[in-house]
């Protein structure tokens, strides 16, 4: 487990074919209702493939009508949890080992994104402060700015 702390943690944009123009670089930790936006929204056409930002193990998938809608949680090196939300489809399952080339889902507008432009909400949580991070007392969680981690 300790060796996992020292493996690479640099990530790729998880939405296939998307670059810096697909998200607002100031959206991380931007005021969002009664809290802060804990990640970034990457806008793309509905159905665009979503890849893991970095390889890891899928620890959970969920289909719900509120919040993140169809979502996936992947554990990676550095003890980081990568959250992918508002997916139109989930193409993986809990326990799957995924690489950057795997397709885990498709961009969508599920959950509280219904009726809004299709996008992937992507965030990174951790138990170890690393890089550009913020503490969220509401969830007692450390969130890392994904933009600063992308290659």
Name the predicted role of every residue range:
Residues 1-71, 100, 109, 146-151:
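Surface-exposed, glycine-biased beta-strand/turn segments
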Residues 6-14, 93-100, 118-151:
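Acidic, glycine-rich catalytic/binding loops that coordinate metals and/or anionic ligands
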Residues 44-46, 89-90, 94:
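Active-site acidic-Proline motif in GNAT/NAT acetyltransferases
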Residues 47, 77-79, 110, 125-129:
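Solvent-exposed coil/turn segments that connect beta secondary-structure elements
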Residues 52-91, 117-121:
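Zn2+-dependent peptidoglycan hydrolase active-site motif and core
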Residues 103:
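Glycine-rich acetyl-CoA-binding "A-motif" of GNAT/NAT acetyltransferases
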Residues 107-120:
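Active-site loop architecture of trypsin-fold serine endopeptidases
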């Amino acid at each position: 487990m300790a060796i996992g702390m020292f493996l690479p943690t640099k990530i790729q944009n998880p939405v296939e074919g998307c670059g810096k123009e697909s998200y607002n670089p100031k959206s991380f930790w931007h005021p969002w209702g009664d809290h802060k936006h804990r990640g970034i929204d990457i806008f793309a056409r509905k159905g665009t493939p979503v890849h893991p930002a970095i390889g890891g193990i899928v620890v959970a998938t969920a289909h719900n009508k509120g919040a993140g809608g169809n979502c996936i949680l992947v554990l990676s090196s550095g003890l980081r949890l990568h959250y992918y939300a508002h997916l139109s489809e989930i193409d993986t399952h809990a326990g799957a080992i995924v690489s950057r080339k795997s397709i885990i889902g498709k961009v969508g507008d599920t959950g509280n994104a219904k009726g809004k432009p299709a996008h992937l909400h992507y965030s990174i949580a951790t138990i170890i402060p690393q890089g550009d991070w913020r503490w969220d007392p509401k969830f007692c969680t450390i969130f890392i700015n994904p933009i600063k981690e992308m290659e």
